[in-house]
Curated annotation (Swiss-Prot):
Molecular functions (GO terms): glycosyltransferase activity; metal ion binding; oligosaccharyl transferase activity
Catalytic activity: an archaeal dolichyl phosphooligosaccharide + [protein]-L-asparagine = an archaeal dolichyl phosphate + a glycoprotein with the oligosaccharide chain attached by N-beta-D-glycosyl linkage to a protein L-asparagine
Gene name of this polypeptide: aglB
Residues the UniProt record annotates as site (Interacts with target acceptor peptide in protein substrate): 84, 364, 722
Signal peptide start-end: none
Native species: Methanococcus voltae
Regions of compositional bias (Low complexity) in chain numbering: 11-20
Stated family: Belongs to the STT3 family.
Listed GO CC annotations: plasma membrane
Protein name: Dolichyl-phosphooligosaccharide-protein glycotransferase
Domain notes for this protein: Despite low primary sequence conservation between eukaryotic catalytic subunits and bacterial and archaeal single subunit OSTs (ssOST), structural comparison revealed several common motifs at spatially equivalent positions, like the DXD motif 1 on the external loop 1 and the DXD motif 2 on the external loop 2 involved in binding of the metal ion cofactor and the carboxamide group of the acceptor asparagine, the conserved Glu residue of the TIXE/SVSE motif on the external loop 5 involved in catalysis, as well as the WWDYG and the DK/MI motifs in the globular domain that define the binding pocket for the +2 Ser/Thr of the acceptor sequon.
Cofactor: Mn(2+); Mg(2+)
EC number: 2.4.99.21
Chain positions covered by the region annotation Interacts with target acceptor peptide in protein substrate: 592-594
Enzymatic class: transferase
Length: 917
């Protein structure tokens, strides 16, 4: 036993003796008592995690009952939030109904494989097994057995909150193993569970995989640390924990496709640490042999530890690879070798395929700044810094090593194992976070463990040095931290202090268990403090509790209250239900990819692409169809995608092989898709590429197929807001170098304007605010009199002075609805203008009168970049398909998710016409 360990042992013995000689006969150091306390801590932390996430169910984002009804089911239970949860909800429905995650089985190489017919229509894709769907079905079956009104969506809503309860266990025990501190483990567990980047994507309602991306690695690290801890003992504990880590690794691919990152972190640690222990053992052995020192037992202990570490390393590295290969196939293992290189290319503008890289516009994959990484990890730079300090402090554990200055040939040195693992873990995840804000959550566990180590180190340091004066520095420091925490709460919202203790009462039993376990722990701690005869130790324990409160309170304050508005709603549901009941089963829904998972779930119809297939050539084609003003081209694109998918431009297609490039293939397709089949045939035969008759026939089978699938388009208000994204891809210039920045490429956009429309003396007057400053406002003033449209710009100062000038818009487009009919007015105002004005006035909807009793009409207007003024999307969403011959508005309903037109969720049918003639 080393001197340091003797000191700790003596201190613990003193504490034990103090407890036994206390005012009570109750022994707080009894193993059963400690075990019960640990169980209570775990229960409290687990239900605290659950309760914080239950806040979303309270639907506190509004008090409007009508608005609440739109975002909840018939039983008042909130819909799922975000987008991806609806994919897993559909997979859960398939698993419940079919026993696998596909909606059907497909014969591939003689095997019946679960198949998802709806995603990436009409091709479909293999349906992969996922643990989230299994857990969702389990929760549903248990809950539905008790309450028949429970739906699968209701069960899915609570799955992330339930799974989050398991986050705290590995974090708590990892920190306690390193520091022997319960309070340090509790702080780390709370910070990890409630950190912003993890919390927002694991709240109730966000039934997605982020929780499963983190959870397995936490258990793997905990088991590896336990395996290393027992590596000096002559028992099987070390190998048992190593086996548990390996088995958890084998489950990881079920939960996340990027499982390999955790595998590489642990491999790096085990390899480096095994090498280090080998060098250390040889050094000790050689030194003691040369000095003829009698340290046989210690040398044997070092040897045993080294051999066990080698066994653990082999079991995890080789055994893990074998298990994963056996369970998932060689391709999964081989993909893990290539995956890190693919990850490093996330921010490339153009993918290696030659098509634009959609991932560059996915917000959660935006490159994160250092400030964003720090604020999104633990919530503040202070906790971030404390986490790093804690990782450094994990070095301060002692092990034996030979030094010539010590007479017995052996001395103590820093133990690197915990610091080594945490440093590797932090470094890898920090690199990941720098590549995209989505990955900041991966960095939270090592930082949280670092904070827990910091707390545990402070606790042990003061406890082991009660006879010194360190408390005169430590206690004021802790007091400052507590005061800072209280100031943070006050600055945020002092009215929410009660809600920090009672964040949600939506699940009374969970609230009761959390409060009951907390009450018992408080009683236990108060009794322990009263029983303690060592007053300095009492002060130490009190100040450590205050330190813990001071560290976790600001984080809790930032997430209480917390609300999240669902994306899906009854307005959308009305139109999607129409698709489900009124369209053929082979119909395809085409829209931008973001809502694709919702559409497949609700309509039971194929979609062109969705959140799992956004980074494909279809981003260009769908963007092209919506941004072009050529209706025939848009129609041809919709027909091709809905009926033959990617067949025309796959890597083994005639066009790619014959033209030699994606650019040339795109040029040919843009030329022939607007044409009838006979005209397209002529164009191909006259092409400089000299296509043979067979090749022409194969191309036309893809672009002008004999058998087509009906296509239905969806537009919605948020699609207006993200026009700069889909038009960016739709206007992609393949002639530009692959690395051309986004600012150098063409895109378009829309901006909603405040609009006022009235009728004065038989003149329709529409005023739109286009610029607002502290001194003046600028409006566009559009008038329609005697079927003639005129316009001007008008500046109005704060004191009422007005100045008019010529309208500098490229074009003004105005649609007036009256008596069930629509009339379009078009005016080219300024040929050199870069912006256009799109206006819609509904004379059938009078929303009030002005001071002269003139009617005020429902109206809306948008500023559009000139390249989108006549786009298919503009005609669809703003003007209900007016001006289009082959695309017809079929259904429209409320869209409460974003500002814009109402009804703002629209469904259109596409008539392919006589394309085949």
């Amino acid at each position: 036993m080393t001197e340091n360990n003797e000191k700790v042992k003596n201190s613990d013995s003193a504490n034990n003796q103090s407890s036994k000689n206390s005012k009570f006969n109750f022994n707080f150091e009894d193993k059963k008592v400690k075990c019960a306390k640990t169980i209570l801590i775990i229960i409290f932390l687990a239900f605290l995690s659950f309760q914080m996430r239950a806040q979303t169910a309270d639907m506190g984002f509004t008090t409007n009952e009508q608005y609440l009804d739109v975002f909840s089911d018939d039983n008042g239970r909130m819909y799922l939030t975000a987008l991806d949860p609806y994919y897993y909800l559909r997979m859960s429905e398939n698993y419940l109904e079919n026993g696998h995650t596909g909606d059907t089985l497909k014969n591939i190489d003689g095997q019946q494989v679960p198949w998802d017919s709806y995603k990436y229509g009409p091709t479909g894709a293999r349906a992969t097994f996922n643990l989230l769907s299994v857990v969702t079905v389990w929760v549903y079956q248990v809950w539905h057995a008790m309450d028949s009104t429970v739906t699968l969506m209701n069960a899915a809503f609570w799955v992330p909150a339930i799974l989050s309860m398991f986050l705290i266990t590995p974090i708590f025990f990892t920190v306690r193993r390193i520091t022997s501190s319960d309070i340090g483990g509790a702080v780390a567990a709370i910070l990890a569970s409630l950190s912003p980047s993890i919390f927002v994507k694991t709240v109730a309602g966000f039934s997605d995989t982020p929780i499963l991306e983190i959870l397995p690695l936490l258990f793997i690290v905990w088991f590896i640390i336990e395996a290393i801890h027992y590596s000096k003992e002559k028992n099987y504990k070390s190998l048992i924990y190593g086996l548990l880590a390996t088995l958890m690794l084998a489950l990881y691919p079920f939960m996340w496709s990027a499982w390999w990152y955790g595998y590489y972190i642990v491999i790096a640690f085990l390899v480096i640490y095994a090498i280090y222990k080998g060098i250390s053992y040889n050094s000790i052995a050689k030194y003691t042999k040369s000095k003829n020192n009698n340290h046989k037992d210690k040398i044997e202990s070092e040897k045993l530890e080294m051999l066990n570490i080698l066994k653990i390393s082999g079991l995890f590295i080789i055994g893990g690879a074998v298990l994963i290969t056996a369970l998932y196939g060689v391709s999964t293992t081989m993909n893990a070798l290539q995956a890190p290189l693919n990850y490093l290319g996330l921010d490339e503008v153009s993918s290696q395929t030659g098509w634009p890289n959609v991932l560059t516009t996915v917000s959660e994959l935006d490159t994160a700044s250092l400030d964003e990484i720090i604020s999104s990890s633990l919530g503040s730079i202070h906790l971030f810094a404390i986490g790093l300090i804690g990782i450094f402090l994990s070095l301060f554990r002692k092990v034996l090593t030979p030094v010539k200055q010590i007479s017995n040939g052996l001395a103590e040195k820093l133990d690197i194992k915990y610091a080594l693992l945490l440093i590797i873990w932090f470094a890898v995840t920090f690199l990941a976070a720098s590549k995209g804000v989505r990955f900041v959550a991966l960095m939270v566990p090592p930082l949280s463990i670092g904070v827990g180590i910091f707390v545990g180190f402070i606790e042990q340091f003061i406890k082991n040095n009660l006879d010194k004066k360190y408390e005169y520095v430590a206690y004021p420091t802790i007091a400052i931290i507590v005061l800072y925490a209280l100031f943070t709460i006050y600055r945020a919202d002092s009215a929410d202090l009660v809600r920090m203790l009672l964040p949600s009462n939506y699940v009374p039993i969970a609230e009761g268990i959390m409060l009951a376990s907390l009450a018992v722990l408080i009683i236990y701690k108060v009794a322990e403090l009263i029983a303690e005869s060592n007053k300095k130790l009492v002060m130490n324990k009190i100040f450590m509790i205050l330190l813990a409160i001071g560290l976790i309170t600001p984080t809790i304050a930032t997430i209480v209250p917390f609300y999240s508005v669902p994306t899906y709603n009854d307005g959308w549901g009305e139109s999607l239900e129409w698709i489900n009941t009124q369209t053929p089963n082979n119909s395809v829904v085409t829209c931008w990819w973001d809502n694709g998972h919702i559409y497949t779930w609700k309509t039971d119809r194929m979609v062109t692409f969705d959140g799992s297939s956004q980074n494909t050539p279809r981003a260009y084609w769908v963007g092209r169809a919506f941004s072009t003003s050529n209706e025939s081209l848009a129609n041809g694109i919709f027909r091709m995608l809905a009926s033959s998918g990617d067949k025309a431009y796959t890597t083994d297609s005639v066009l790619i092989k014959k033209t030699g490039s994606i650019k040339n293939t795109v040029d040919v397709l843009n030329e022939i898709l607007p044409l009838t089949k006979s005209d397209a045939q002529k164009a191909l035969k006259n092409s400089s590429y000299k296509f043979t008759d067979t090749e022409v026939s194969e191309i036309l089978d893809a672009t002008h197929p004999k058998v087509t699938n009906p296509d239905y388009l969806i537009t919605y208000n948020r699609m207006t807001s993200i026009a700069s994204v889909w038009s960016y891809f739709g206007n992609w210039d393949f002639n530009l170098p692959a690395g051309t920045s986004r600012s150098e490429r063409e895109a378009g956009s829309f901006q909603g304007l405040q609009t006022y429309a009235t009728n004065i003396n038989d003149t329709l007057i529409v005023r739109s605010l286009i610029q607002q400053t502290a001194e003046y406002n600028i409006y566009t003033l559009i008038e329609v009199r005697n079927e003639t449209l005129t316009g001007a710009m008008m500046a109005v100062t704060n004191d009422g002075q007005m100045q008019t000038q010529q309208l500098n818009m490229h074009k003004v487009k105005l649609m007036v609805n009256e008596n069930g009919k629509s009339k379009m007015y078009n005016s080219l105002a300024d040929p050199d203008g870069q912006l256009s004005l799109l206006i819609k006035v509904d004379k059938n909807s009078i929303i009030g009168t002005d001071g002269s009793n003139n009617p005020v009409y429902s109206s809306s207007s948008w500023m559009a970049t000139a390249n989108l003024e006549d786009s298919v999307y503009s005609k669809l969403h703003f003007f209900d398909g007016e001006g289009l011959d082959t695309i017809k508005l079929e259904k429209e309903s409320l869209d409460p998710t974003a500002n814009g037109v109402q009804p703002g969720f629209k469904v259109f049918s596409v008539d392919y016409g006589n394309y085949s003639k």
